[in-house]
Amino acid sequence: MLQRRSYAFAAGVCLFIALLGVPLIVANYNNYRENGIALLRPQGKNGLDIPKSGVLSLVSLSPSERAGRLQAIAQQSSSRERSRARYLIASDLIIQRQGDKAIAVLQDLEKDYPELAAHIALKRAQAYSLTGDKVRTQAAWQDLLQRHSKSPVAAEALFVLGKNEPQYWQEAIALFPSHPRSLDIARLLLQENPQQPRLQLLLAQYDYQKPEIVPVLDRLVSQSAAQLKPQHWQTVAQAYWENREYGKAAVAYAKSPRTPRNVYRWGRGLQLSTKQTEAISVYKQLVAAYPNAEESGMALMRLARISKPKEAISYLDRIVTRFPKQAGEALVAKANLLDNLNSKQSAAKVRQLLLDKYGDSDAAAEYRWQVAQEKAAKKDYQAATRWAEAIPQRNSEHILAPRAAFWIGKWAEKLGKNEDAKTAFEYVLSKFPQSYYAWRSATLLGLDVGDFTTVRQINPDFSLPQRVLPLAGSPALKELYQLGQDADAIALWQVEYSNPEKPTVAEQFTDGLMYLAKGENLIGINEISTLEDRDIPLEKAEYQNLSKQLGYWQARYPFPYLPLIQTWAQQHQLNPLLVTALIRQESRFEPTIRSVAGAVGLMQVMPGTAQYIAEKINVSEYNLENPQDNIQLGTWYMDYTHNRFDNYSLLAIASYNAGWSNVEKWLKRFNTQDPDEFVESIPFGETQGYVRQVFGNYWNYLRLYNPQVSRLVAKYSDVHPSMSIDVASN
């Protein structure tokens, strides 16, 4: 049963310690303590499994909270657990600036813990730097460099030693160009002398996701263009592209090596920067030079969209002939053009061809759903069902599949076919357990999962086991990540990850975990979520196997800022999982993100709304980019929208997005008591999708973290990754 219960909350902790004589050391537990992130241990025999461990179960605790238990484990006889405990104790002592004690704990640890030998040497050097003994500190850094010269950890020694001997910095850049310390060196050297194309290109290649890279690129292009070779221009172009500087990217792609992707992005960059005539010319060059490349099909579609109807139809016909993966989309576009030309019979023939020959395409699914909705609007529910039922059967991976299957059940209810409706809802829950419509189906089946009228009052129990194991990376990286030593794991991964343009499934999943560990949640969630888009058969099979694991889904639905969310959810009597679900949709847990409309932070609070709330609660100073302030103000407003609509969460969440006045207008306008029909009737496409996304997020947090609901869903679905019962309740 889902129950109301009270929580005991623990504030997160974040420490950043600067060691004397060495660069800033970010406490490795910072993100996982400050943000309350929990990436959980999956079940089943697969690459994500982590054996039970007393040490790993303590990773989520602060140094003071875990010290006693780690000491007890460290006193045991020689074992892996003992070595792990000693390593964490030493790391915690360094954070607490107790160098002498850390040195003692680290003594001879390499003998029992060889996979972290290089990092033990690093910890020893960091510990000595706290003692004030310059001679031994220097010796420790030299020892690290000599004994582990081929390890990426050597970059840390090269960074420190290079402060007095500049050749070490050049050695770091040469040996470990992608290591964070090498990038730090490049930035420092560019401050001294900005005109160094080699270093600017280094940052463009390995640090392009930082927004401050754009001025670096601008300087490089304006001052050193004559020195750049085509491959350099490709590096610059990609960095501009990733930062959405499409016009600048187009200029750079024009000078890059001629490949289908580069030429396509050249044309697309021109189009996005409103240079349509030039874009058309480049698209035509692409199609002529690479007639069978996938990008040529994309270019033909772009040309069709910006051309006059008859010319557009010729482009679409070429797509149908040469690019079967894009044929469905091309046929729909052609049919729409024929409709506009008043050639209704020809349009009908094209749509029939779509269904007959390309019935498994996304375009066919979307067309079927369009017709099904039209039939349902006329209350012809039998015809609507006939059109919709092919979608989950032939397009099971399409986003419309669970929606169509759900509405088949709703229409069956209207026809008085209650058994058929029950079968349809069970089908949705069985085949699409991750969908918003699975939650709605579970509700209509009478399962105890909450609904729009009760979800606010529920305080679900949820369980937070230990972190998942990365699929890719060295044994050292996996061990560091399990131990919560995030800064060291991330630095190591930045060197080991050599194929970011074409990563394997395992590499992309691991990269997503590292972004989550850095607190860059939008990128991390996106990397993990878009694994489902793989279409190469082998990679698709790898994703299907991964998606059966609980750890994959829990990484996709993480818990940043959990302590703050719990605190303010309790303050305003809100379901903490619903608050988390809303934040995931609003900001992907990015505290400084801003919308084009001006909304700010985790819960995307508008400045004017924030001022109104602050006056109501007598808060004189606040910062919407501060998670504490943003969640305090956002949950107040979430409470307000719930109170305005009598705790009916459907309307409260819709009004959070569209404003309560619009929701009140819709209530008067739409004559329905059916919540599902109301959602479908919302005239704002953004708000309609927003409602489904927020409650879909809520459902996923519930089914992935609540043991009771997880077991309930598992009774219906064999693709739902159920939880085991050996997890600790939050």
Where are these regions (language model features)?
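Cell-wall glycan-active module
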Residues: 2-101, 105-107, 111-112, 116-119, ...
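A short, structured beta-strand-centered segment in the mid-to-C-terminal lobe
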Residues: 621-629
